[in-house]
């Protein structure tokens, strides 16, 4: 390579070029990793003496320059630490890079000493990479290679700082290069308005004239008129412009590559290697690891696109674009809710080398929830009240739910639905009301990174009713061919406006993923909240009662679902979760479930054992069927699902006689007997498939009988014809070679080669093509084989394309039975849930509840279902009775010492009620449960920073919500209402609220309090209200008081955890302080002060009691007696004090 010529355009530029070259060479030598392979002599030693003298003269004439900073610069400690950390980053796919380095080193030969003339010595790989990177650095100012927000504002130096996160050369060299660029960057900002790229020869010049800079810039601009991007980079830029919000994985041969910011994201999140290649940072992963890495990126909240090659080498060779780049297109997009497809299928792709927990989160539900607001009522909007519509879809299972409701400023209704669905992704307009935005922020901020809800925003225009109505009608009108289709459209347009807006937005969103087909059957839509079918359990109650997850670490263990979940299948687990969050209201349906659980529990028939064994072996066929419905499944997955369904059909068909004779439950008989008939279509599709081809994914041999696939048959006949011609050509080859035993050989996939010993190569015709050789033999193709083998490969690749098209048609035909097969899976899930509840009932001391229409909750020796399991058999839970009914007491006021078990008791009552209405046995000796339409709770004391609410505000907001929604058929639980404010205000609010529920709402109520005045409501409503407390014992030894002592010893309380009639006069809070290891001195002082205050209060109460008697006296004798008693009481009080 010849030395760079001095730039023209003036003496200064001409004379300074060698000096700049010397500076640049010293820069390369200053970095520890940039040493020439030839010798230690730098470029400065090779500078022409005459040019050097001219440069020295020019430098003498110039004004003195400021002292140069130390070079290389000293790195700050935090940068040095970061560099060390990056050097130690484990590399997953550095094999291709190492091979490339080795290949280049071998090509260079290791010595450059033989060079002569003006040719520059060869530099090592690292030197050439840095030189090349500095050249590309100047071209990297292209807007498409950087985030749009940084294109106009960042300097060249700042842009360079983005690049070297992980490259072929070390970070110290890049930091030095960054410093070398800084001076030229400042000149560029002064002398150019646009993004001008400079020649490397300008780095080191400190006195280049403005005229020379302009000429250099003009020359550089002309140079850039040609494309600076590789064809692959241009292809990537075009695809990235269409999918700016997605991380793109681009198929390139045997690997998938990331470019630009996508590569940096992949390197950071996947812990893989990335480096600078041409104009972009790049990283790559092997094709067989795509499943793992896509799932990891999706779990982090990214939208991931997979770009695949749509051409093959053989077909491309005969096309018009044979010299151009392989065509590619986006074949799949994935987010948390749309993780469906052959590339990411966990059913097939998992192997022993993959850690399932590392790449998969809880897949029990994966809802995409779209929220829309009706903003027509301005007055309600100012108050925070608004009408909301939602549509939730679960693409993995095909489930679609919708709802519309009026919500208050607290957004409790929306929070309830979000808590029930637990969406993994939200689809929202670009702007929502302030209160809704606050709820969304709170919901997306409380979870950890991998479990965080992903938020996707769309422009508000897609949520406008006029646009949404048109989009929805167009979507459903294309399938309207009969009266039924017209009825479907009529049902859709009659939905509430916000629901239609949400539906239109979700249709548009799912079209991007090719998943909109699941919305084409609106008769399968289900309304989320139906007050006529299910008990109302809002989000606060789900959280307070720990129904789905505990409040300690937000995990399933320690929740009611954890106690009840003994399911064997994934789809059974999802159905049980619905049962738990939606207890039934219809007595007939509740008793049907209880009858089924009771029969499984007590039956001695072996049929239930057989069914349970069948369920234990099942994969997640619900998700598999949905993947088939969307035509995103592999042949392996399809065969596994269809074969599983076929075996289920056969097994359930075999037990039909036993079911008819041994099973009495109507629910079990119905679902079990319907399963074989619903699964009958799968046998036909299974017989068509070739098992071995399906298991290995070979679509060309997938179908046994090709009579239904004429295109595949035609293509295979053409292929066989070419093969026959090639085989017949062997006779001619034998004649040419005069070798009757000559045969074709296949080596490394290369077919139809003629193998000749190297000693006999002279007899080979000159027009034969040599394909390969070894030390002993050479292999050839004749011209006839070359032509026909090329044609054969083209036909084979065309066959693959034809088979793929026929495969999609085959899946389309199978999808006609999707809904009947899904119904069978739902029946299997129901059986699985019944078996799970039966296993719960076998745990011991569980009873079948008596469920009735009357308003009552009567429980004998009931236990908290979760605490009972957590304690185990060694530490048994203390059982308690409950008796609430419309005819007697329907309100329990519960007092007692702190930590006495009050909260556990009221939760126990609520959970037993929920279990009974699910259709489960309950932990009690006896239980009679009247159907309640909702359970409302106000428990705990904590502020809400996200809502900007104090503890007391949070209490009153929840209480106001209960007051609005509770009915006489509800169960209301209020735990220590009023403790977030002063004593007087707290007592007043607690008293007034409880009286309202007693007098007006008339619901079954459990009210926990530490305020004795609230207990006086029993006197006013003696038939409806009863006072209770949690039993305890006070130790006499430690509670004895020394009247003359200045310090008192706090009481020692033993908890009995037994509900007892009556009022607890004290709460014994100091006992809790003692258990918490509060220092003894503080406890004694607190005990003394407590007794003192208690005495003052008792004195006031006694005086009020005496003065109340005074107004009832009518003669002097009674007055005299009253005076004596009063004086005696006052004397005793003064002695005590």
UniProtKB/Swiss-Prot annotation:
PROSITE patterns: DNA_MISMATCH_REPAIR_2. The modification Phosphoserine is found at residue 33. SUPFAM superfamilies: DNA repair protein MutS, domain I, DNA repair protein MutS, domain II, DNA repair protein MutS, domain III, P-loop containing nucleoside triphosphate hydrolases. Residues 31-122, 201-222 are annotated as: Disordered. Residues 75-297 are annotated as: Interaction with EXO1. The keyword Ribosomal protein does not apply. The keyword NADP does not apply. GO terms for cellular component: membrane; MutSbeta complex; nucleoplasm; nucleus. Residues 31-42, 51-62 have a biased composition (Low complexity). SMART domains: MUTSac, MUTSd. One of its GO terms (biological process) is DNA repair. It comes from the Eukaryota. Residues 81-97 have a biased composition (Basic and acidic residues). Residues 63-76 have a biased composition (Pro residues). GO terms for molecular function: ATP binding; ATP-dependent DNA damage sensor activity; double-stranded DNA binding; enzyme binding; mismatched DNA binding. ATP binds at residues 896-903. The modification Phosphothreonine is found at residue 1099. NCBIfam families: PRK05399.1. Belongs to the DNA mismatch repair MutS family. MSH3 subfamily. Component of the post-replicative DNA mismatch repair system (MMR). Heterodimerizes with MSH2 to form MutS beta which binds to DNA mismatches thereby initiating DNA repair. When bound, the MutS beta heterodimer bends the DNA helix and shields approximately 20 base pairs. MutS beta recognizes large insertion-deletion loops (IDL) up to 13 nucleotides long. After mismatch binding, forms a ternary complex with the MutL alpha heterodimer, which is thought to be responsible for directing the downstream MMR events, including strand discrimination, excision, and resynthesis. It is linked to Endometrial cancer: A malignancy of endometrium, the mucous lining of the uterus. Most endometrial cancers are adenocarcinomas, cancers that begin in cells that make and release mucus and other fluids. Component of the DNA mismatch repair (MMR) complex composed at least of MSH2, MSH3, MSH6, PMS1 and MLH1. Heterodimer consisting of MSH2-MSH3 (MutS beta). Forms a ternary complex with MutL alpha (MLH1-PMS1). Interacts with EXO1. Interacts with MCM9. This is DNA mismatch repair protein Msh3. It comes from Homo sapiens. The gene is MSH3.
């Amino acid at each position: 390579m010849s030395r760079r010529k001095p730039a023209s355009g003036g003496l200064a530029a001409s004379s300074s070029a060698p000096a700049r070259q010397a500076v640049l060479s010293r820069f390369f030598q200053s970095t520890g990793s940039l040493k020439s392979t030839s010798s230690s002599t730098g470029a400065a030693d090779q500078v022409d003496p005459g040019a050097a003298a001219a440069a020295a003269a020019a430098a003498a004439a110039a004004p003195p320059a400021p002292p140069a900073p130390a070079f290389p610069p000293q790195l700050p400690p935090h940068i040095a630490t970061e560099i060390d950390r990056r050097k130690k980053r484990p590399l997953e796919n550095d094999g291709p890079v190492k091979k490339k380095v080795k290949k280049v080193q071998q090509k260079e030969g290791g010595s450059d000493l033989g060079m002569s003339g003006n040719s520059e010595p060869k530099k090592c790989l690292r030197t050439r990479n840095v030189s090349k990177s500095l050249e590309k650095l100047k071209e990297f100012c292209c807007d498409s290679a950087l985030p749009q927000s940084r294109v106009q504002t960042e300097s060249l130096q700042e842009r360079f700082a983005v690049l070297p996160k992980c490259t072929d050369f070390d970070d110290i060299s890049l930091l030095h290069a960054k410093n070398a660029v800084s001076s030229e960057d400042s000149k560029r900002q002064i002398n150019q308005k646009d993004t001008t790229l400079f020649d490397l020869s300008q780095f080191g010049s400190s006195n280049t004239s403005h005229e020379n800079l302009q000429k250099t810039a003009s020359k550089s601009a002309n140079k850039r008129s040609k494309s600076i991007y590789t064809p692959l980079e241009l292809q990537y830029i075009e695809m990235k412009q269409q999918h700016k919000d997605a991380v793109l994985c681009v198929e390139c041969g045997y690997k998938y590559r990331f470019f630009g910011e996508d590569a940096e994201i992949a390197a950071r999140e996947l812990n893989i290697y990335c480096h600078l290649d041409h104009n972009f940072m790049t990283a790559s992963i092997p094709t067989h690891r795509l499943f793992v890495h896509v799932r990891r990126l999706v779990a982090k909240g990214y939208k991931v696109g997979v770009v695949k090659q749509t051409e093959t080498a053989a077909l491309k060779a005969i096309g018009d674009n044979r010299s151009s780049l392989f065509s590619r297109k986006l074949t799949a997009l994935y987010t948390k809710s749309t993780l469906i497809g052959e590339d990411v299928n966990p059913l097939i792709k998992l192997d022993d080398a993959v850690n399932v927990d590392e790449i998969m989160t809880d897949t029990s539900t994966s809802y995409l929830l779209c929220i829309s607001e009706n903003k027509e009522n301005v007055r309600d909007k100012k108050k925070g009240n608004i009408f909301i519509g939602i549509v939730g879809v679960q693409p993995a299972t095909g489930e679609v739910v919708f709802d519309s409701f009026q919500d208050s400023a607290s957004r409790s209704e929306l929070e309830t639905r979000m808590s029930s669905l637990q969406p993994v992704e939200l689809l929202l307009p670009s702007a929502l009301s302030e209160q809704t935005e606050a709820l969304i922020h709170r919901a997306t901020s409380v979870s950890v990174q991998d479990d965080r809800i992903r938020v996707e925003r769309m422009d508000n225009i897609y949520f406008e009713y006029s646009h949404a109505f048109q989009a929805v009608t167009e979507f459903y009108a294309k399938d309207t061919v009969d009266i039924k289709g017209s009825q479907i459209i009529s049902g859709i347009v009659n939905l509430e406006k916000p629901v239609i807006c949400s539906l239109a937005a979700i249709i548009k969103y799912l079209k991007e993923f090719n998943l909109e087909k699941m919305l084409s059957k609106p008769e399968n839509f289900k309304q989320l909240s139906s007050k006529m079918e299910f008990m109302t359990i809002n989000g606060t109650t789900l959280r307070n009662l720990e129904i789905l997850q505990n409040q300690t670490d937000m995990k399933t263990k320690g929740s009611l679902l954890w106690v009840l979940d003994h399911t064997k299948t994934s789809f059974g687990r999802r159905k049980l979760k619905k049962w738990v969050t939606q207890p039934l209201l219809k007595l007939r349906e509740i008793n049907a479930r209880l009858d089924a659980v009771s029969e499984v529990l007590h039956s001695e028939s072996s049929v239930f054992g057989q069914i349970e064994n069948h369920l234990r072996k099942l994969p997640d066929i619900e998700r598999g069927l949905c993947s088939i419905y969307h035509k995103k499944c592999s042949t392996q997955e399809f065969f596994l699902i269809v074969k599983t369904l076929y075996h289920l059909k056969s097994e359930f068909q075999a037990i039909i006689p036993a079911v008819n004779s041994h099973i009495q439950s109507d629910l079990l008989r119905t679902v079990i007997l319907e399963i074989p008939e619903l699964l009958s279509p799968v046998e036909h599709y299974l017989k068509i498939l070739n098992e071995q081809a399906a298991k290995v994914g070979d679509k060309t041999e997938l179908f046994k009988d090709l009579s239904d696939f004429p295109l595949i048959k035609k293509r295979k006949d053409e292929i066989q014809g070419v093969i026959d011609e090639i085989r017949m050509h062997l006779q001619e080859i034998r004649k040419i070679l005069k070798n009757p035993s000559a045969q074709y050989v296949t080596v490394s996939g290369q077919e139809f080669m003629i193998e000749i010993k190297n000693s006999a190569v002279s007899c080979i015709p000159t027009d034969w093509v040599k394909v390969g050789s070894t030390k002993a033999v050479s292999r050839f193709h004749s011209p006839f084989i070359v032509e026909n083998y090329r044609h054969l490969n083209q036909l084979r690749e065309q066959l693959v394309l034809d088979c793929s098209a026929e495969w999609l048609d085959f899946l389309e035909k199978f999808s006609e039975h999707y809904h009947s097969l899904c119904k069978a899976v739902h029946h299997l899930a129901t059986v699985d849930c019944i078996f799970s509840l039966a296993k719960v009932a076998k745990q011991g001391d569980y009873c079948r509840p008596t469920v009735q229409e009357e308003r009552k909750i009567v429980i004998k020796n009931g236990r908290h279902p979760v605490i009972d399991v957590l304690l185990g058999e060694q530490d048994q839970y203390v059982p308690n009775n409950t008796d609430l009914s419309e005819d007697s007491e329907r309100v329990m006021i519960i007092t007692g010492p702190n930590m006495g078990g009050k909260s556990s008791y009221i939760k126990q009552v609520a959970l037993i009620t929920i279990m009974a209405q699910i259709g489960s046995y309950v932990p009690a000796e006896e239980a009679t449960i009247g159907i309640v339409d909702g359970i409302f709770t106000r428990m705990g004391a904590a502020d809400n920073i996200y809502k900007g609410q104090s503890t007391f505000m949070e209490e009153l907001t929840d209480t106001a919500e209960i007051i609005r929604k509770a009915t006489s058929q509800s169960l209301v639980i209020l735990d220590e209402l009023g403790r977030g404010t002063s004593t007087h205000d707290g007592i007043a609010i607690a008293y007034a609220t409880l009286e309202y529920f007693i007098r007006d709402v008339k619901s079954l109520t459990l009210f926990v309090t530490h305020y004795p005045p609230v207990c006086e409501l029993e006197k006013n409503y003696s038939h409806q209200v009863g006072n209770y407390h949690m039993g305890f014992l006070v130790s006499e030894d430690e509670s004895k008081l020394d009247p003359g002592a200045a310090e008192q010893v706090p009481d020692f309380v033993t908890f009995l955890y037994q509900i007892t009639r009556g009022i607890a006069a004290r709460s014994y809070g100091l006992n809790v302080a003692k258990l918490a290891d509060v220092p003894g001195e503080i406890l004694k002082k607190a005990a003394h002060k407590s007794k003192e205050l208690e005495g003052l209060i008792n004195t006031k109460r006694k005086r009020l009691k005496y003065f109340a008697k005074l107004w009832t006296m009518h003669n002097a004798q009674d007055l005299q007696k009253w005076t004596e008693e009063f004086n005696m009481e006052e004397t005793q009080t003064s002695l005590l004090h």
